[in-house]
Amino acid sequence: MEPRAVAEAVETGEEDVIMEALRSYNQEHSQSFTFDDAQQEDRKRLAELLVSVLEQGLPPSHRVIWLQSVRILSRDRNCLDPFTSRQSLQALACYADISVSEGSVPESADMDVVLESLKCLCNLVLSSPVAQMLAAEARLVVKLTERVGLYRERSFPHDVQFFDLRLLFLLTALRTDVRQQLFQELKGVRLLTDTLELTLGVTPEGNPPPTLLPSQETERAMEILKVLFNITLDSIKGEVDEEDAALYRHLGTLLRHCVMIATAGDRTEEFHGHAVNLLGNLPLKCLDVLLTLEPHGDSTEFMGVNMDVIRALLIFLEKRLHKTHRLKESVAPVLSVLTECARMHRPARKFLKAQVLPPLRDVRTRPEVGEMLRNKLVRLMTHLDTDVKRVAAEFLFVLCSESVPRFIKYTGYGNAAGLLAARGLMAGGRPEGQYSEDEDTDTDEYKEAKASINPVTGRVEEKPPNPMEGMTEEQKEHEAMKLVTMFDKLSRNRVIQPMGMSPRGHLTSLQDAMCETMEQQLSSDPDSDPD
């Protein structure tokens, strides 16, 4: 049924005609997410008619069908103006039972009405900055969190819980003030941690939770993880007190469980991704819960520590490395978590090094060539995205105990140069972190070839032919002067800039490097002091 015909039916004021028209329109457009521009004005007219009645109040028997029509129209981004007034948003909040102030529309406990209203609000908040502002001003997050807090005591339909959480996610993703309000005023981390515990089936009695999460629980858990990520992204900074640390460690144990279980359907990797993203927001000292599981018969044990979680994160990393797009979002969070675990815990670092950087045997292949995990990570070290190459290089550097020679050995100087330059370690240096002395066992193959390995490429290379063979001394001098002239021209035209190494290990212009070196020599020479 066309929107013009529905609008004309609504204008008749005849109840049966109106409801039949709306019912027909809803059935025809239930799966419509794109709309014909030619009918845009008709849809706006219909939206205005629906909103005017919505704000005045609907009879209980008409609410679901009426709200379904509003939901369909709210998908059209060009038709949102009638729905984004303070009065219409207040009416929808009342029907969703999340209004903090009493409106002219009576609250409804009908879960079908609540669900349709929540869907309408989600559409509006997603697409309209005005609706986002009005929802924040109306403090919808307050009543939403109140209802979320009742999930343990009362039974709510899955869809209502899901869209409660989805609306929370949208509000916290799009409004900084709502993020802060949920984090600070409403104690959102504790509330949502309890809700996640309930959703995962973790019981206070310590009974083992299910290892396969059903599909509905998976959907809700992912929304909870996304909201928690939003509110902790910028809020957890520096040191936390003992009470907060205990809360984050408890959350960490739940996230540890998340990365160890599978989900119904094909959403396991997506679910693990949200858990890993949130792990990256936790205070660093709370990540120790990833290594506190007691070893058991089927666990991966290393140096007396259960490495099941670290192994699961490595498997997840390998899956993400197969992706060719959005690598920053795919691999940066898990690499950051693994890096911090390796930095703080020697058993984790040694286990990861054994898996990622096993003793070198193949010394004739460049480090970035191949399908081993080491090869894939070294390739990332020269990725166009600076964040991707930074986290990949940082991870491998920590696995090498921040030893520059060891890092170059496994990656090649050419690949390592970016991180070394950023840290002022181009000329070598000592690591910043506190690392115990780890032995780096060289294989016989590496020992035999070590003297022939090109440190820049990280592999044994055939000696190239001498390009000056057969030239006279005059010809060699002529070619050398041509080269000097070419470099001088490139330098004068600022195509290239000659670089040198400063005494502090940083790359700098050659002129500045020479000046800095001379200044240091003069300052250290006792004969240079004034008389």
Swiss-Prot record:
- List, alphabetically, the Pfam families matched: Ric8
Please give the function described in this protein's UniProt entry.
Chaperone that specifically binds and folds nascent G alpha proteins prior to G protein heterotrimer formation, promoting their stability and activity: folds GNAI1, GNAO1, GNA13 and GNAQ. Does not fold G(s) G-alpha proteins GNAS nor GNAL. Also acts as a guanine nucleotide exchange factor (GEF) for G alpha proteins by stimulating exchange of bound GDP for free GTP.
Entry protein name: Chaperone Ric-8A
Under the heading InterPro entries, the entry gives: ARM-like, ARM-type_fold, Chaperone_Ric-8_A/B, Gua_nucleotide_exch_fac_Ric8
Post-translationally, this protein is described as follows, namely: Phosphorylated at Ser-436 and Thr-441 by CK2, stabilizing its interface with G alpha proteins.
Q: Which residues carry this modification: Phosphoserine?
A: S436, S502, S523, S524, S528
Q: Which GO terms describe its molecular function?
A: G-protein alpha-subunit binding; guanyl-nucleotide exchange factor activity; protein folding chaperone
Keywords on record: Chaperone, Cytoplasm, Guanine-nucleotide releasing factor, Phosphoprotein
GO cellular component annotations, sorted alphabetically?
cell cortex; cytoplasm; plasma membrane
Summary of subunit composition and partner proteins: Interacts with GDP-bound G alpha proteins GNAI1, GNAO1 and GNAQ, and with GNA13 with lower affinity. Does not interact with G-alpha proteins when they are in complex with subunits beta and gamma. Interacts (via C-terminus) with RGS14; the interaction stimulates the dissociation of the complex between RGS14 and the active GTP-bound form of GNAI1. Interacts with NCS1; interaction is favored in the absence of Ca(2+) and myristoylation of NCS1 is not required.
- Compartments it resides in: Cytoplasm, Cell cortex; Cytoplasm
Family from the record: Belongs to the synembryn family.
